[in-house]
């Protein structure tokens, strides 16, 4: 069985383990695509890895084993997660980048959180955490076991948070649904990921 591994942030480890695989690297920039194709050809691995210059949101869902998204900017991370879920990915490794979308929605701050958000830097970090907490919770509601880790030291990049998901197919706990609904109601936000996976969320939480 061939492992299908789209890298949504752009194999060697799995290849050294003798595991047949196909890798798809997605990056909107044609320059990145052309450079990576040349590198793959130089390394002699072009038969098992391909690169595309496309928007993540425009990629057709396909059967996938592992999805990796590295520093896809703002809602491009949500595009990557949504694509992975709709492609039935079994493992997710998501390292988000900037979080502008939810930050722009934080206008009616619930008390006493204005004590935090009145400071621009702290509001930015709060929106980062809120965005990724909601992403993780949405994945839980869709049958993934999720944890959030630091995948590299802060001296290399401040964007060192990773959301890891393993698909279990478990039905969402009623308390998890309640917590999610309470969180978006309290902050008066509409997560981009929830909009992209609206049908899946309705099906999962009302079944």
Q: What is each residue range found by the language model?
A:
Residues 1-4, 98-100:
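Short glycine-enriched loops at secondary-structure junctions
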Residues 3-19:
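Conserved SAM-binding loop of SAM-dependent methyltransferases across substrates and taxa
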Residues 19-27:
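Conserved SAM-binding motif I beta-strand of class I
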Residues 28-207:
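Class I S-adenosyl-L-methionine
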């Amino acid at each position: 069985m061939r492992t299908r591994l789209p890298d949504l942030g752009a194999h060697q480890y799995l290849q050294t383990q003798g595991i047949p695989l196909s890798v798809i690297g997605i990056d909107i920039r044609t320059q990145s695509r052309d450079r990576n194709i040349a590198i793959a050809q130089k390394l002699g691995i072009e038969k098992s890895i391909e690169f595309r210059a496309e928007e993540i949101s425009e990629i057709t869902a396909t059967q996938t084993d592992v999805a990796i998204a590295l520093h896809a900017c703002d809602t491009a991370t949500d595009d990557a997660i949504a694509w992975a879920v709709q492609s039935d990915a079994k493992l997710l490794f998501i390292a988000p980048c900037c979080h502008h979308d939810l930050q722009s929605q934080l206008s009616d701050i619930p008390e006493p959180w204005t004590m935090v958000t009145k400071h621009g830097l702290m509001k930015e970090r709060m929106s980062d955490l809120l965005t990724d907490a909601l992403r993780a919770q949405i994945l839980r509601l869709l049958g993934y076991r999720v944890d959030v880790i630091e995948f590299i030291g802060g001296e290399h990049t401040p964007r060192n948070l990773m959301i890891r998901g393993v698909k279990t197919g478990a039905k969402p706990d009623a308390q998890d649904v309640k917590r999610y609904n309470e969180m978006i109601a309290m902050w008066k936000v509409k997560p981009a990921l929830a909009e992209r996976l609206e049908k899946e969320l309705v099906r999962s939480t009302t079944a």
